[in-house]
Amino acid sequence: MDFSILESGFLPSKISTTLSKEFDDIEYVGNNLPKILANNQIESEVLNLEPEKDISNLGIDELERAMLLYSYIGHAYIWGNLKTDKVIPKNISKTWFKISQKLGRPPILSYASYALNNWKLQDKNKPFDLENIRILQNFLGGMDEDWFIMIHVAIEYEAKEILSNLKHYFLDQNEDQSFLESALESIRKINSIMNRMPEKCDPFIYYNRVRPYIFGWKNNPATPQGVIYEEVDEYNGKPQLFRGETGAQSSIVPALDALLGITHSNDPLREYLDEMRLYMPIEHRNILNHLDEWSESKRRSVTNQDKSVKLTNEIIKEVHTFRNKHLEYARTYIHEQSLSNQNNSNVVGTGGTPFMKYLDKHLQETVPTND
């Protein structure tokens, strides 16, 4: 495995903030999306876009920028359009599909576009922290929407301290203890960041302004048959069912699960977690596959080291804390809000799952094994 790709963790080493002039019309819609949605103009704006774009000369960072724009605009069209038919016009469907094929994931808004490639530092000369992150793209805008994404970006940044040291952990047994000590410190910082979600993201605003736009078309009552991508020959005019954006598409927790030996029983939850990998960048998918293979033998090598076992269990407890906080937020940001709103499902999460049941099961399966 090429460990160098983990130097920045699962965050990309380079993020494009604009595309070439050929994409000016797409950039315009993206830049003005909050106003377009507020004025119910998304349909007319999309139908004015040029259907075919040449993406042959785009680098990976530019493809990710294009994927971000088309994904946001596509979701805005489906969820911010007064029309009831769920058809994505050829004006965006054809190029969106081509981009998705190049990147190796479905034409849908995924975590990679929503968070990983959707930020910049306001001041590059200042340290990375929440106050110095700026979000590149949003739907309706506002601090609550931005803060929700910023928290995820900050968590990804902190996780890079774990991921960038994996090479030493796997290749040098003498580094076991120092790696685990560093990982424990990082996961504690991640939990501190997670605790800051309520500071600037209000549950009511999240539920009513942020959440509705990130749903997918699979296991969604609003799109029972899926969504048609107009003139995408590979789909033969048939509706497609893709999962919506969800934190389960982040590679951090699956990587920690593999490293720590946290397993999930063979059931629909496990199948869902495996499916989420299809929405991750290919490189992340490959890393997780390597970790799944290597981690079992690596864990065997530390079972005779009392200090390492103790540190491993401390990290597992911190992952348990993380999942417990996630479950708490699911209650306050979604379940409790849904009690007064029948139009925004509390049963199915944005990824199309019975999220409360799944999150609780995650929590129950995250327990130390070598106390």
Which residues are covered by each model-predicted region?
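Surface-exposed peri-terminal alpha-helical interaction modules
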Residues: 1-371
